C-alpha cells in the first residue's frame, strides 16, 4: 500500500502562533516603556516565524484526513523481528528495546477521528531514512501500546 503524508499545521500550532501574534500586538499597542514595545515586537516576530515553519500535523494526500505521527527508534538487530511484527501483530513489538540504537525507525501515523493507523519501518542509510517495509493499515485499537 502506498500512502503519502504531508506536513500541515495542527490546531496546537495555530493556537501557539496566533496567541503570540495577539500578545505581541497588544504589547506593541499599549502605551508603555520601550522595553515592553521591544518585547511585543519580538513576540510578533516569533509568531510570524512560527506561522511559517511550525507544522506538526500530517495529512493524508488521498483522503485529506489529519494524522499524528509517532516515531520509535530501534537497533539494527531488531530489524527482522519488527518487520515480522508489523506485518501481522504490531502489539507484539518489544518496546523495552527502544532507544538502544537508531538504525531502524518505526513511523506510526494515527488518527483518533478516523480510527485508523498506518505503520512503516524505515532503515537508516547515510543522512536519511529509507523505507524497508510496506505501509500497513491497522485499527487504532490494535496499536494502542505503540502510540503511548
Residue ranges, per PLM feature:
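Cytosolic juxtamembrane segments of membrane proteins
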Residues: 58-105
Amino acid at each position: 500500500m502506498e500512502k503519502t503524508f504531508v506536513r500541515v499545521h495542527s490546531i496546537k500550532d495555530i493556537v501557539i502562533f496566533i496567541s503570540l501574534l495577539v500578545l505581541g500586538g497588544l504589547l506593541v499597542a499599549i502605551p508603555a516603556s520601550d522595553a515592553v514595545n521591544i518585547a511585543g515586537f519580538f513576540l510578533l516576530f516569533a509568531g510570524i516565524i512560527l506561522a511559517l515553519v511550525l507544522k506538526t500535523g500530517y495529512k493524508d494526500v488521498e483522503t485529506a484526513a489529519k494524522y499524528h505521527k509517532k516515531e520509535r527508534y530501534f537497533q539494527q538487530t531488531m530489524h527482522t523481528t519488527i518487520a515480522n511484527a508489523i506485518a501481522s501483530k504490531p502489539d507484539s513489538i518489544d518496546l523495552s528495546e527502544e532507544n538502544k540504537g537508531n538504525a531502524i525507525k518505526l513511523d506510526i501515523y494515527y488518527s483518533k477521528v478516523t480510527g485508523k493507523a498506518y505503520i512503516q519501518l524505515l532503515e537508516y542509510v547515510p543522512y536519511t531514512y529509507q523505507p524497508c517495509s510496506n505501509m500497513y493499515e491497522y485499527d487504532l485499537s490494535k496499536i494502542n501500546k505503540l502510540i503511548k
